[in-house]
Amino acid sequence: MIEIDGRSLRVEDVYAVAVEYDRVSISDDTLKAVEEKHEAFLKLINSGKTVYGVNTGFGSLLNVHIERDQEIELQKNLIRSHSSGVGDYLENRYVRAIMAVRLNSLAAGYSAVSADLLNMMVEMLNRDVIPAVPKYGSVGASGDLAPLAHIGLAMMGEGKAFFEGRLMDSARALEKAGLKPYQFKEKEGVALINGTSFMSGILSIAVMDAHDILENAIRSALLSFEALGGTSKAFTPWILGARPHLGQVAIGNRFREYLTGSDIVKRADSVKVQDAYTLRCIPQVYGSVADVIDYVENVLSVEINSATDNPLFNGEEVVSGGNFHGEPVALAADFLAIALTDLGNMVERRIARLVDTNLSGLPPFLTPDSGLNSGYMIPQYTAAALCNRNKVLAYPSSADTIPTSANQEDHVSMGATGSLKLLEIIDNVRYIIAIEYLLGSQALEFTDKGMSPSTRKIYEKIREKVEKLDHDRPPSFDIETIRKMMDKKEFISALP
């Protein structure tokens, strides 16, 4: 059970709600504090105070006055008009993450929503009523308006939603779950949709996936390192400590420990001076990726516990601000995209080295009868194609901005785009690593098997499901098998 209180949500909690379907709850104290703020806000509105998005129009329509008896209708119209997303529906796990982040942001108490709204979101998550949210439509300021509006639309019993994984009209989904359509109160529509929870929810899942990617990349690199006869001299502690970036030192020490007991490395240490960069600089490159992952997680730890609505209410005054601007998240998503793209680049270069007999000293394309057999010639092409795709996707979305709302919103973050394309990069890098697992294990068939105990664990785990290559067969199926093993964390479990 994940407790929502508006201040202590962790990235791993978001993952637990989204992927592992952990239930959520809100304490009575949190609900009481939220409701008190809501009641205080209503008193302010009833006094005639002008508040953006409550008794005014939105965006460039901010100078249009809304009568008191139209304020509820305004919120409903906002949800309907802003539900303008297009494209395929986002996977339910990402929508669950988005809802968890938005729920926590609203629970902070600055958005002046009622406890009823929070309870509705809790019940939808716990009863598996997940709004159908199109992927595209957010520019990342003023918040993730379009996709979050689709969540509000489903809450009202309009649009589409998934119930227990099946797509249907949201009214039917709510009914099957034993819920009634939600009636938005003053400010609740704008509070729900005006925030960074779309990009933050997606990035929360992405950064957890990035941890797994790095762990797998370390393990797949062990196979290539030993197959190529690498020397561990570059991982000497004082060398790593002479440039003490946290990630570099940590990765270098782990890699050296994993190689302990290898006869292959022991021989290489006695005769080789240094290796090519893709072997020698694993701590520097992988360590930098680890540092980026930590940076992104730190950004998210702040963002998912922040009030990103506009305007905000502290119990006494309402102030319009800019916390909805997704720049911190947008930059973090782009940074992670660049880091993972370069991780894939290094892995692909080792793959290329494995199949090149002039560089590896191994049989051409890792087949015992090359010529008649092409062996693993083409998987390197696949890795190269995926790297090329990632290099296109790695262009920073945050480098662009397109003014919206008649230039009232004249600078935007494009953080949603950055988070979405990061998902494709992650998928591509997983496949690149799967190819290194496949080819690295095959390359070890041509050594004396004097690998370290740690490397042997990975090698044997692969051989449980993928046979060595004696003659040509389609590599695609083996790549997919290894990819599924990665998804199940089998290699991480085999070598903690």
Curated annotation (Swiss-Prot):
InterPro entries: Aromatic_Lyase (IPR001106), Fumarase/histidase_N (IPR024083), HutH (IPR005921), L-Aspartase-like (IPR008948), Phe/His_NH3-lyase_AS (IPR022313). It is found in: Cytoplasm. Keywords: Cytoplasm, Histidine metabolism, Lyase. The modification 2,3-didehydroalanine (Ser) is found at S142. It comes from the Archaea. NCBIfam families: hutH (TIGR01225), PRK09367.1 (NF006871). This is Probable histidine ammonia-lyase.
